From Swiss-Prot:
Domain of life: Bacteria
Descriptive protein name: Large ribosomal subunit protein bL17
A Pfam family the protein falls into: Ribosomal_L17
This protein's GO CC annotations: cytosolic large ribosomal subunit
InterPro entries in the record: Ribosomal_bL17, Ribosomal_bL17_CS, Ribosomal_bL17_sf
Gene Ontology biological process terms from the UniProt entry: translation
GO-annotated molecular function: structural constituent of ribosome
Subunit structure: Part of the 50S ribosomal subunit. Contacts protein L32.
Gene3D superfamilies: Ribosomal protein L17 (3.90.1030.10)
Record-linked PANTHER family: LARGE RIBOSOMAL SUBUNIT PROTEIN BL17M (PTHR14413:SF16), RIBOSOMAL PROTEIN L17 (PTHR14413)
Record-stated family: Belongs to the bacterial ribosomal protein bL17 family.
Keywords: Ribonucleoprotein, Ribosomal protein
Encoding gene, per UniProt annotation: rplQ
HAMAP family reported in the protein's UniProt record: Ribosomal_bL17
Length: 120
């Protein structure tokens, strides 16, 4: 299985992808580097597929990965609840391809290629 190391140790890489996945669930659109977005795409495919399954085991598997952050302060809904109640039903008839990556220009400081990744 090949993956991008993203210049980090295994635990740092997992933490980065957890943070990015949680942010993408909450905001539904984030700006990041191209390499991070391409790795995040496969993680989000798995999370949304778990959300579509919707059983207790899938919810626990997703809860083990997604951070416990508040997605909507008015309703008190957290990221996991948003994934299972709002995002997953949207893609019930779609077999994969839940995210879109749009290229931006290079980052000003170091020239890293930047993209916007969003839920379709």
């Amino acid at each position: 299985m090949s993956y991008r190391k993203l210049g980090r140790t295994t635990s740092q890489r997992k933490a980065l992808l957890r943070d990015l996945a949680t942010d993408l669930i909450i905001n539904e659109r984030i700006e990041t580097t191209e390499a991070r977005a391409k790795e995040l795409r496969s993680v989000m495919e798995k999370m949304i597929t778990l959300g579509k399954r919707g059983d207790l085991h899938a919810r626990r598997q997703a809860a083990a990965f997604i951070r416990k952050e508040v997605a909507n302060s008015e309703t008190g809904q957290d990221a996991l609840q948003k994934l299972f109640s709002d995002i997953a039903p949207r893609y019930q008839d779609r077999q994969g391809g839940y995210t879109r990556i749009m290229k931006l220009g290079p980052r000003r400081g170091d020239g890293a290629p930047m993209v916007i990744i969003e839920l379709v």
